[in-house]
Amino acid sequence: MTEEHVVYIGKKPVMNYVLAVITQFHEGAKEVSIKARGRAISRAVDVAEIVRNRFLKDDVDVKEIKIGTEELPTADGRTTNTSTIEIVLARKA
């Protein structure tokens, strides 16, 4: 999967990201990866579920879910652990 088929989840409303994922599929992508970390993880799950259950119900399924931890530096020089998630949605055959 190329980097162009990745949607990074941030603080915008959920429907903005849903539209981004749907646009990727309509432009011909076979797979779209939804990535988030920290507090945005729940928003990433919401995006995947809305795309899968409401908009592309019979066309898309969850292919893979990866979870992990990243060490991020803080302002005072220490590191903090932040959870990450990657949800890969794939078009059904």
UniProtKB/Swiss-Prot annotation:
Gene Ontology terms: cellular component: chromosome; cytoplasm
Cross-referenced InterPro entries: Alba-like_dom_sf (IPR036882), DNA/RNA-bd_Alba (IPR013795), DNA/RNA-bd_Alba-like (IPR002775)
Modified residues (N6-acetyllysine): 11
Post-translational modification as stated in the protein's UniProt record: Acetylated. Acetylation at Lys-11 decreases DNA-binding affinity.
Main location: cytoplasm
Family label: Belongs to the histone-like Alba family.
Record's function text: Binds double-stranded DNA tightly but without sequence specificity. Involved in DNA compaction.
Stated name of the protein: DNA/RNA-binding protein Alba
